[in-house]
Amino acid sequence: MELKTIEAAEAKPAVSPEGEMMIAQCLAAAANGEIAAYFDLGVAFSTGSHGVNCDMIEAHKWFNLAAAKGHEEAAYCRADISDEMTAREIAGAQRQAREWLSAERRKAA
């Protein structure tokens, strides 16, 4: 089943096949600990690019993971989007980042 959005009385795919492929590749790379993939996912979610909805909590999570691994630009991006987020949203993003790390550690064990 393909998700659709309705615009101007026309149905169109909500996510392009290219966008789905890019996100899937980034998620796979992120699962292998690739810092650039964390950053790319942060960019995608903060801008709503590659067919994903703009989601600042998800973006903060990925920027946080990249920044924690030493990605300087991710740290700047995380700080920038934090200005647009509530304390509750930031706490949620931090919780999600910790959950991601915990899940990755369990997989590695």
Predicted features, each with a name:
Residues 54, 58-76:
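Amphipathic, hydrophobic secondary-structure cores in small proteins
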Residues 40-48, 77-82:
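Hydrophobic face of amphipathic alpha-helices that form TPR/SEL1-like repeat modules
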Residues 14-24, 52-61, 88-92:
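Structural signature of tandem alpha-helical TPR/SEL1-like repeats
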Residues 23, 27, 35, 39-43:
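Alpha-helical tetratricopeptide repeat
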Residues 31-35, 48-49, 63, 69-71, ...:
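Short helix-capping/linker turns of helical repeat alpha-solenoids
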